[in-house]
Amino acid sequence: MITITFNGAINSDNIDLYQDIFSGEVQNPNGCQIKGSFFVSHKYTNYSAVQELHRRGHELAVFSVTNKDDPEYWTGGSYDDWLAEMAGSRLIIERFANVSDGSVIGIRAPYLRVGGNKQFEMMADQYFVYDSSITAPLSRVPIWPYTLYYRMPHKCHGNAQNCPSRSHPVWEMVINELDRRDDPFYDESQSGCQLVSSCSNIVDPDQFARMLRHNFQRHLDSNRAPLGLHFNAVWLKENKGFKKELIKFIADMLDRNDVYFVTMLQVSIFPVAA
Protein backbone atom coordinates (compact mmCIF):
# COMPACT_ATOMS: atom_id res chain seq x y z
CA MET A 1 0.00 0.00 0.00
CA ILE A 2 1.11 3.54 -0.80
CA THR A 3 -0.47 6.70 0.57
CA ILE A 4 -0.16 10.12 -1.05
CA THR A 5 -1.04 13.03 1.22
CA PHE A 6 -1.07 16.81 0.95
CA ASN A 7 -1.11 19.44 3.70
CA GLY A 8 -2.58 22.94 3.60
CA ALA A 9 -5.14 25.02 1.77
CA ILE A 10 -7.02 23.70 -1.27
CA ASN A 11 -7.78 26.32 -3.91
CA SER A 12 -7.27 27.38 -7.52
CA ASP A 13 -3.50 27.39 -7.01
CA ASN A 14 -3.31 23.63 -6.61
CA ILE A 15 -6.56 21.93 -7.64
CA ASP A 16 -5.21 21.39 -11.17
CA LEU A 17 -2.20 19.60 -9.68
CA TYR A 18 -4.49 17.20 -7.82
CA GLN A 19 -6.51 16.59 -10.98
CA ASP A 20 -3.31 15.73 -12.87
CA ILE A 21 -2.11 13.27 -10.21
CA PHE A 22 -5.48 11.67 -9.46
CA SER A 23 -6.91 11.54 -12.94
CA GLY A 24 -9.92 9.30 -13.26
CA GLU A 25 -8.03 7.11 -15.72
CA VAL A 26 -5.61 5.83 -13.06
CA GLN A 27 -6.97 2.79 -11.26
CA ASN A 28 -5.87 0.30 -8.63
CA PRO A 29 -5.73 -3.41 -9.55
CA ASN A 30 -9.31 -3.86 -8.28
CA GLY A 31 -10.60 -1.29 -10.78
CA CYS A 32 -11.18 1.47 -8.22
CA GLN A 33 -9.62 4.86 -8.83
CA ILE A 34 -6.57 5.74 -6.76
CA LYS A 35 -7.26 8.06 -3.84
CA GLY A 36 -5.32 10.57 -1.75
CA SER A 37 -5.67 12.13 1.69
CA PHE A 38 -5.87 15.90 2.10
CA PHE A 39 -5.15 17.57 5.43
CA VAL A 40 -7.01 20.83 5.00
CA SER A 41 -6.22 24.16 6.66
CA HIS A 42 -8.95 26.79 6.67
CA LYS A 43 -7.02 29.88 5.58
CA TYR A 44 -7.14 30.44 1.79
CA THR A 45 -9.20 27.28 1.18
CA ASN A 46 -11.91 27.18 -1.48
CA TYR A 47 -14.57 24.86 -0.11
CA SER A 48 -16.12 24.20 -3.50
CA ALA A 49 -12.81 22.57 -4.46
CA VAL A 50 -12.82 20.63 -1.18
CA GLN A 51 -16.34 19.42 -1.90
CA GLU A 52 -15.26 18.22 -5.34
CA LEU A 53 -12.35 16.22 -3.89
CA HIS A 54 -14.74 14.60 -1.44
CA ARG A 55 -17.20 13.83 -4.24
CA ARG A 56 -14.42 12.03 -6.10
CA GLY A 57 -13.78 9.82 -3.08
CA HIS A 58 -10.64 11.40 -1.67
CA GLU A 59 -10.20 11.58 2.08
CA LEU A 60 -10.49 14.89 3.91
CA ALA A 61 -8.73 15.38 7.24
CA VAL A 62 -7.85 18.44 9.31
CA PHE A 63 -4.68 20.53 9.43
CA SER A 64 -6.05 23.30 11.73
CA VAL A 65 -8.03 26.49 11.37
CA THR A 66 -5.21 29.03 11.70
CA ASN A 67 -2.11 27.06 10.57
CA LYS A 68 -0.36 29.36 13.05
CA ASP A 69 3.27 30.09 12.18
CA ASP A 70 4.68 29.20 15.61
CA PRO A 71 5.80 25.62 16.30
CA GLU A 72 5.73 26.26 20.05
CA TYR A 73 2.03 27.07 19.86
CA TRP A 74 1.35 23.52 18.71
CA THR A 75 3.83 21.82 21.03
CA GLY A 76 2.49 23.55 24.12
CA GLY A 77 -1.13 23.99 23.10
CA SER A 78 -3.86 23.53 25.68
CA TYR A 79 -6.80 21.15 25.33
CA ASP A 80 -8.97 24.10 24.31
CA ASP A 81 -6.41 25.22 21.70
CA TRP A 82 -6.47 21.80 20.06
CA LEU A 83 -10.24 21.65 20.31
CA ALA A 84 -10.67 25.01 18.58
CA GLU A 85 -8.08 24.28 15.89
CA MET A 86 -8.98 20.71 14.96
CA ALA A 87 -12.59 20.11 15.94
CA GLY A 88 -13.25 23.64 14.71
CA SER A 89 -11.62 22.85 11.39
CA ARG A 90 -13.78 19.75 11.01
CA LEU A 91 -16.94 21.75 11.65
CA ILE A 92 -15.91 24.26 8.98
CA ILE A 93 -15.20 21.52 6.43
CA GLU A 94 -18.49 19.78 7.15
CA ARG A 95 -20.47 22.99 6.85
CA PHE A 96 -18.85 24.78 3.93
CA ALA A 97 -17.91 21.72 1.84
CA ASN A 98 -21.22 20.02 2.64
CA VAL A 99 -19.54 16.91 4.05
CA SER A 100 -22.20 15.20 6.12
CA ASP A 101 -21.06 11.57 6.21
CA GLY A 102 -18.84 11.76 9.32
CA SER A 103 -15.74 10.89 7.30
CA VAL A 104 -13.44 13.66 8.60
CA ILE A 105 -11.69 11.67 11.32
CA GLY A 106 -7.96 12.37 10.91
CA ILE A 107 -5.55 15.04 12.13
CA ARG A 108 -2.11 16.27 11.17
CA ALA A 109 -0.44 18.98 13.24
CA PRO A 110 1.20 21.93 11.47
CA TYR A 111 5.00 21.57 11.40
CA LEU A 112 4.36 17.99 12.59
CA ARG A 113 4.58 19.39 16.13
CA VAL A 114 2.76 16.93 18.33
CA GLY A 115 0.69 18.38 21.18
CA GLY A 116 1.30 15.71 23.81
CA ASN A 117 -1.48 14.22 25.91
CA LYS A 118 -3.70 17.29 25.52
CA GLN A 119 -3.94 16.76 21.76
CA PHE A 120 -4.83 13.09 22.10
CA GLU A 121 -7.30 13.62 24.94
CA MET A 122 -9.14 16.06 22.70
CA MET A 123 -9.03 13.60 19.80
CA ALA A 124 -10.57 10.81 21.87
CA ASP A 125 -13.27 13.11 23.24
CA GLN A 126 -14.14 14.36 19.75
CA TYR A 127 -14.07 10.89 18.14
CA PHE A 128 -11.11 11.48 15.87
CA VAL A 129 -9.78 8.09 14.78
CA TYR A 130 -6.17 8.83 13.87
CA ASP A 131 -3.30 11.28 14.04
CA SER A 132 -0.55 11.54 11.43
CA SER A 133 1.96 13.89 13.03
CA ILE A 134 4.46 11.57 14.73
CA THR A 135 7.60 10.67 12.81
CA ALA A 136 9.54 7.41 13.12
CA PRO A 137 13.27 7.87 12.49
CA LEU A 138 14.85 6.19 9.48
CA SER A 139 15.70 2.62 10.41
CA ARG A 140 16.31 -0.74 8.83
CA VAL A 141 12.65 -1.72 9.13
CA PRO A 142 9.79 0.81 8.73
CA ILE A 143 6.96 1.01 11.26
CA TRP A 144 3.39 -0.07 10.65
CA PRO A 145 0.59 2.19 11.95
CA TYR A 146 -0.09 1.50 15.62
CA THR A 147 -2.55 2.41 18.36
CA LEU A 148 -1.65 4.58 21.31
CA TYR A 149 -3.22 2.14 23.73
CA TYR A 150 0.38 1.02 24.24
CA ARG A 151 3.81 2.62 24.29
CA MET A 152 5.09 3.98 20.98
CA PRO A 153 7.28 1.34 19.25
CA HIS A 154 10.00 3.90 18.48
CA LYS A 155 11.60 6.87 20.19
CA CYS A 156 9.98 10.30 20.18
CA HIS A 157 11.79 11.75 17.21
CA GLY A 158 12.60 15.42 16.68
CA ASN A 159 13.81 18.36 18.71
CA ALA A 160 11.42 19.49 21.46
CA GLN A 161 8.69 17.09 20.36
CA ASN A 162 5.87 16.54 22.85
CA CYS A 163 4.83 12.95 22.26
CA PRO A 164 1.99 11.42 24.29
CA SER A 165 3.04 9.68 27.49
CA ARG A 166 -0.27 8.06 28.41
CA SER A 167 -2.61 5.58 26.74
CA HIS A 168 -5.11 6.97 24.23
CA PRO A 169 -7.73 5.20 22.05
CA VAL A 170 -6.30 6.69 18.87
CA TRP A 171 -4.47 5.30 15.86
CA GLU A 172 -1.11 6.78 14.91
CA MET A 173 -0.59 6.75 11.16
CA VAL A 174 3.11 7.16 11.72
CA ILE A 175 5.26 9.04 9.21
CA ASN A 176 8.25 6.84 8.38
CA GLU A 177 11.22 8.95 7.36
CA LEU A 178 12.22 8.52 3.74
CA ASP A 179 15.71 7.36 2.82
CA ARG A 180 17.04 10.15 0.60
CA ARG A 181 20.60 8.89 0.16
CA ASP A 182 21.95 8.61 -3.38
CA ASP A 183 23.89 5.52 -2.30
CA PRO A 184 22.22 3.92 0.73
CA PHE A 185 25.08 1.45 1.16
CA TYR A 186 27.84 4.02 1.55
CA ASP A 187 26.36 7.46 2.19
CA GLU A 188 25.62 7.42 5.92
CA SER A 189 25.79 11.18 6.45
CA GLN A 190 22.25 11.89 5.22
CA SER A 191 19.46 11.58 7.75
CA GLY A 192 15.93 10.69 6.69
CA CYS A 193 13.26 13.24 5.77
CA GLN A 194 9.63 13.43 6.89
CA LEU A 195 7.96 15.17 3.96
CA VAL A 196 9.13 14.66 0.40
CA SER A 197 9.57 18.43 0.12
CA SER A 198 11.99 18.37 3.08
CA CYS A 199 14.44 16.09 1.25
CA SER A 200 16.66 19.06 0.47
CA ASN A 201 19.35 17.08 -1.35
CA ILE A 202 16.86 15.96 -4.03
CA VAL A 203 17.41 18.61 -6.67
CA ASP A 204 16.56 16.98 -10.00
CA PRO A 205 13.84 14.65 -11.34
CA ASP A 206 16.17 11.68 -11.79
CA GLN A 207 17.17 11.81 -8.13
CA PHE A 208 13.52 12.07 -7.15
CA ALA A 209 12.59 9.06 -9.28
CA ARG A 210 15.39 6.97 -7.74
CA MET A 211 14.34 7.98 -4.23
CA LEU A 212 10.72 6.95 -4.82
CA ARG A 213 11.69 3.54 -6.18
CA HIS A 214 14.33 2.89 -3.54
CA ASN A 215 11.92 3.62 -0.70
CA PHE A 216 9.21 1.48 -2.25
CA GLN A 217 11.65 -1.40 -2.54
CA ARG A 218 12.87 -0.85 1.02
CA HIS A 219 9.33 -1.21 2.37
CA LEU A 220 8.54 -4.15 0.08
CA ASP A 221 11.68 -6.10 0.99
CA SER A 222 11.32 -5.66 4.76
CA ASN A 223 7.88 -5.82 6.39
CA ARG A 224 5.67 -4.25 3.69
CA ALA A 225 4.63 -1.39 5.93
CA PRO A 226 2.63 1.20 3.95
CA LEU A 227 4.84 3.69 2.13
CA GLY A 228 3.77 7.25 2.87
CA LEU A 229 4.55 10.02 0.39
CA HIS A 230 3.69 13.31 2.06
CA PHE A 231 3.79 16.44 -0.08
CA ASN A 232 3.45 20.18 -0.05
CA ALA A 233 1.58 21.22 -3.20
CA VAL A 234 3.77 24.29 -3.79
CA TRP A 235 6.86 22.09 -3.97
CA LEU A 236 5.38 19.95 -6.74
CA LYS A 237 3.96 22.95 -8.60
CA GLU A 238 7.36 24.63 -8.64
CA ASN A 239 9.12 21.46 -9.81
CA LYS A 240 7.18 20.25 -12.83
CA GLY A 241 9.77 17.58 -13.56
CA PHE A 242 9.08 16.09 -10.14
CA LYS A 243 5.34 16.02 -10.83
CA LYS A 244 6.01 14.17 -14.08
CA GLU A 245 8.16 11.60 -12.26
CA LEU A 246 5.53 11.12 -9.55
CA ILE A 247 2.87 10.41 -12.17
CA LYS A 248 5.23 7.96 -13.90
CA PHE A 249 6.00 6.28 -10.56
CA ILE A 250 2.28 5.81 -9.91
CA ALA A 251 1.80 4.26 -13.35
CA ASP A 252 4.81 1.95 -12.92
CA MET A 253 3.63 0.77 -9.51
CA LEU A 254 0.13 0.03 -10.79
CA ASP A 255 1.61 -1.95 -13.67
CA ARG A 256 2.88 -4.43 -11.06
CA ASN A 257 -0.75 -5.31 -10.29
CA ASP A 258 -0.01 -5.82 -6.57
CA VAL A 259 0.27 -2.20 -5.37
CA TYR A 260 -2.65 -0.08 -4.18
CA PHE A 261 -2.76 3.69 -3.70
CA VAL A 262 -5.11 4.24 -0.78
CA THR A 263 -6.16 6.81 1.80
CA MET A 264 -4.96 6.99 5.38
CA LEU A 265 -8.41 5.89 6.52
CA GLN A 266 -8.23 2.79 4.33
CA VAL A 267 -4.84 1.93 5.83
CA SER A 268 -6.22 2.28 9.37
CA ILE A 269 -9.05 -0.12 8.52
CA PHE A 270 -6.73 -2.70 6.88
CA PRO A 271 -5.32 -4.32 10.09
CA VAL A 272 -8.87 -4.72 11.42
CA ALA A 273 -10.16 -6.15 8.14
CA ALA A 274 -7.16 -8.45 7.82
Question: Where do the model's predicted regions map?
Answer:
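Active-site beta->alpha N-cap acidic-glycine motif
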Residues: 1-59, 66-70, 90-95, 99-121, ...
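Alpha-helical scaffold elements lining the catalytic groove of polysaccharide deacetylases
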Residues: 14-16, 67-98, 148-221
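His/Asp/Glu-enriched short active-site or ligand-binding loop at hydrolase and phosphoryl-transfer sites
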Residues: 65-69, 125-150, 175-180, 195, ...
